[in-house]
């Protein structure tokens, strides 16, 4: 943000004074804090805060100087866009005033695309017969109706409009009624939120399959109020799938519980004990846990009883122990110990092998405002060097080798150990340098991304839905929002039409493969 002091009025001599520069940077920090508090007050009042800072330039595309691939030449024939369309009706048209002796030579086709939007009501007349012995035999409704008074097509349309197109329930109700559909507010809500167990099951299979075959996942979270209380939605995914789950917490315990992919047990195994040792669990509780190595607790209640029985009462000790047995559980179920978690440096995601997003790291530099010519020059130099390093890391991913690995490590040290004329810039460089191992994990694992854009883009879609429809007010509503956001985003990543997917599942056609199978196929084919 802009400094609340006109720097141009400060003399050139004072601008080079270290004390003055330190004071200016201190004022800048205070101004940013004041603006953040103003933004929070504005949000609480229902007003709009200040606009966000411009995005990082790290992922800006380089303009191509050559010709675009696939661009048509001046002499190429124009491709007919309608050649593959299914034709539903054919209407021949005769010319006016055909003279005698004219010979028919064929047709000039002109394709018109249309869409029918109208009510289509069906009366099923279930025949009933009486047998000679006095019993009655009655016909049954088609299975895909499931005893409901609304066809699968209407159910598909409602789900698609609400989850894919972001149409709110009031507008969707008005739309259906204008189309001639006799439907109430309660019935619409029921169609959206009830009897969705098959979809919930497939959503859970998405996470299980993704964790089973992936070498990395991108993670992020966002606020998700529920029933008037603060809550959070966590995203787990990568280029092949997206999975969302809303809970009341954003702790590491919560994240580990989500990674269990539907399982509920707690395992004391080698991996659990190793985690507790790394996190310095004291000897007394650690010995009690080691003495029960190999024990599996089927649910949280049994685990809590174990903690009480073994006099593990300290909150921090309980936290470390619980995180350990949860980690032991997810590794027990097949998650690789080499799984990389790519995040924006939120502490709850720092488990297994942890990689950080370069775009988020560069934002620390981007927000700095220099107060002297030397500081401005230093900032420009550092940003150019970071851009050069990032570009080199992208090239390294395509062709990793030991020589480039060593060179890039040295380049990182050279950039982030630099001392500049800006105290704020020095502090930012020091902070980034402290995350060296997580930012340069790509040198050992060139299969992982350099940024967390995949998770950010996915969570942005959830935020858009939250802004349109507000917070959830029922458990079924929250569960359905998570489920259909997961299914929609995963379909998009797999190249599956969400409309065709909904139609296939609701009509019971089973022509679209399980999304979990498609995830395995896509990830394994690119491994």
Locations of regions flagged by a protein language model:
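Short, flexible loop/hinge motifs at secondary-structure junctions
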Residues: 1-148, 189, 219, 265-321
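Catalytic center-proximal scaffold of phosphoryl-transfer enzymes
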Residues: 6-10, 128-130, 137-527
